[in-house]
Design a protein with these regions (language model features):
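Eukaryotic scaffold repeat domains enriched in small/polar residues
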Residues: 1-79
């Protein structure tokens, strides 16, 4: 695991960009892992080098993937 970005949702959950696993990882406010989103690749829902994160809405975040030079909007409930 290689964390490269972090943001906190309004309900206290954390979203971590994992550069090494090419995923986003969701944690509860206490640090317990809840789920992972994404996989290695260049298609929808896939990442090459996820890095910066920011909250867009209650369940949405913006992800900068420096490997694809792409910005994606991700729903943390549905991926």
């Amino acid at each position: 695991q290689t964390p490269s970005g972090l943001t906190r949702l309004a309900d206290g959950r954390f979203v971590v960009a994992d550069f090494g696993a090419k995923q986003l990882r969701i944690f509860d406010a206490g640090g317990r892992a809840l789920r992972s989103i994404g996989r290695r690749g260049r298609g929808p829902g896939e990442f090459v080098a996820p890095s910066a994160l920011d909250v867009l809405g209650a369940e949405e975040i913006v992800v900068l993937d420096v490997g694809t030079q792409r910005v994606s909007v991700v729903d943390v409930q549905g991926g």
